[in-house]
Amino acid sequence: MKRTRKILLGTLIGLVLLYLVLIIIAYLPYKTTPVKELIGKEDKFIEVDGHAIHYTKQGQGKSLILVHGFAGSTYTWRYLIPLLTDDYTIYALDVLGFGLSDKPPDGNYDMKSQGDLLIGFMDAIKLPSATLVGHSMGGVIIACTDLAAPSRVDKLVMIEPGFYIKTVPAFLKYMFFPLDRIMSRQFYTKSMRKRFLLGSFYDKSKVTEEVIDAYMIPTRTPNALDALTHMMNSVGSQTYEGISVKISSPTLILWGERGAGVPPEVAKRLNSEIQGSKLVSVKECGHYVQEEKPEELVKAIRNFVK
């Protein structure tokens, strides 16, 4: 009996010590850089629902708003924007929790809230309507905007939209503290980001050290880790069923044929569910169509928006 009690006590002490070690690992120093030190000449900020939202504005003509995907930023549009500024006014923004925008630790990061934030952004810049362009998670966000305020949407352009697939594994939703934060730390390491990008690009040569470093910059801004942890716990395993059939705006869907991001059946399903939508397949291209095939994307956008 005494031996059993000692074993149980030893096990309990061991578990407590392990838990304390995990907490220490989760909260190891995480160096951050103030956003103000990262601002360039093209960067602008505007308050939306009490949050500072980062965006850029370039060009002249019909208005296009570009919305990045999960763990992305305005950086993903660096090749696309210069090809459109002659004929379009391009707004590229960082959604809440990413890029240089605010990252409240307890923010509302579900796609409906992000879609509403996009409407708030348009209100703030006094833009009545625009064509919305969304990549991956951004495709879901702009769809939510269309559902909430169809009169504000001229057309939708969805690039590898993240419908019906989980942003992160479902088990993360049930991870107890502090394992959730440890997983978030791991996701925001350079090695993980490199692996993520290499798995998403068809042309691996485009995933250079410079590109990886640029993608890492927003992960080192204040509250980035806290926001990601909250995001993964609250919305990471949602698949957003039932949204596509309610979309009313003219919609263009682009799919990279060699990507691991969005399976072909998802693109085809969306095409069948969104009434009157057009599906364009991009050959020899992965998940990041805007970075691998910007010229083809621009051609498709011009033909669709004209």
Indicate residue ranges for each PLM-predicted region.
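Alpha/beta-hydrolase fold catalytic core
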Residues: 1-62, 87-88, 128, 305-306
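Conserved alpha/beta-hydrolase catalytic His-Asp/Glu region
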Residues: 18, 30-34, 168, 172, ...
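Active-site loop/oxyanion-hole signature of alpha/beta-hydrolase fold enzymes
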Residues: 48, 56-58, 92-133, 299
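Conserved HGGG/HGGXW glycine-rich cap/lid loop of the alpha/beta-hydrolase fold
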Residues: 51, 56-100
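Short glycine-enriched nucleophile-adjacent loop
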Residues: 139-150, 156
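Flexible "cap/lid" loop of the alpha/beta hydrolase fold
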Residues: 147, 156-185
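Short beta-strand/loop motif that positions the catalytic acidic residue
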Residues: 247, 253-255
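Catalytic active-site module of serine/aspartate enzymes centered on a nucleophile-bearing elbow/loop
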Residues: 277-306
